[in-house]
Amino acid sequence: MSSLYYANTLFSKYPASSSVFATGAFPEQTSCAFASNPQRPGYGAGSGASFAASMQGLYPGGGGMAGQSAAGVYAAGYGLEPSSFNMHCAPFEQNLSGVCPGDSAKAAGAKEQRDSDLAAESNFRIYPWMRSSGTDRKRGRQTYTRYQTLELEKEFHYNRYLTRRRRIEIAHTLCLTERQIKIWFQNRRMKWKKENKTAGPGTTGQDRAEAEEEEEE
């Protein structure tokens, strides 16, 4: 037998291409391809018919597959809804949208907090009462009003040394502290001694007694 005989017998088993693709779709499926199975209802005869109908509608003009999504094709063939394909993607996208904005908001909040802290440190003012009051700091000079000075001069004219009780009374009267009254009288006595230096080299007994009484706390 020649090779031509084998070729003729091979092609005679299949119909012509014009008869196979006359409608522009796939040939009709055999019964074994879509056999009904009671355990798999999605692949029954009804689903096979719908799948064949959907496949016939894919190529009405020769290139209509681009206008239909893959989800629609599989949904029509296997009896699934298009929304079932997004059941895993939608929660994942929601989680991403919920996590990423939160991270950016936290980063922005931390940056604003740092900026506010730096601005607060740069604008921090030190008031006089906030400075240290140690012995290394030079103490400012105490100033007295004219009324306070006049009353202290009157008291010094009568008594150059004050008892503690009298110092407390004058401090309450002139709105001063006991320490301020004591310092003023000490300075006034030093001034008075310089003015009256020619009067005598030492102090009298009365002055020493008053000084001892004044130093009692």
UniProtKB/Swiss-Prot annotation:
Q: Which Pfam family is an annotated match for this chain, by its short name?
A: Homeodomain
Listed A to Z, the keywords are: Developmental protein, DNA-binding, Homeobox, Nucleus, Transcription, Transcription regulation
- Please give the residue ranges the record annotates as the region Disordered: 194-217
Q: Where in the cell is it found?
A: Nucleus
The UniProt entry, under SUPFAM superfamilies, shows: Homeodomain-like
GO BP annotations of the record are: anterior/posterior pattern specification; embryonic organ development; embryonic skeletal system morphogenesis; myeloid cell differentiation; positive regulation of branching involved in ureteric bud morphogenesis; positive regulation of transcription by RNA polymerase II; regulation of DNA-templated transcription; regulation of transcription by RNA polymerase II
- Map motif Antp-type hexapeptide onto the chain: 126-131
Instruction: Select a single GO molecular function from the record's annotations and give it.
Output: sequence-specific double-stranded DNA binding
Tell me the DNA-binding residue spans.
137-196
The answer, when asked if Nucleus is one of the entry's keywords, is: yes
GO CC aspect terms: chromatin; cytosol; nuclear body; nucleoplasm; nucleus
What is the recorded function of this protein according to its Swiss-Prot or TrEMBL entry?
A: Sequence-specific transcription factor which is part of a developmental regulatory system that provides cells with specific positional identities on the anterior-posterior axis.
Q: Which family does it belong to?
A: Belongs to the Antp homeobox family.
Q: Could you describe the subunit structure of this protein?
A: Forms a DNA-binding heterodimer with transcription factor PBX1.
Q: What is this protein called?
A: Homeobox protein Hox-B7
What organism is the protein native to?
Homo sapiens (Human)
Instruction: Specify the taxonomic lineage.
Output: Eukaryota, Metazoa, Chordata, Craniata, Vertebrata
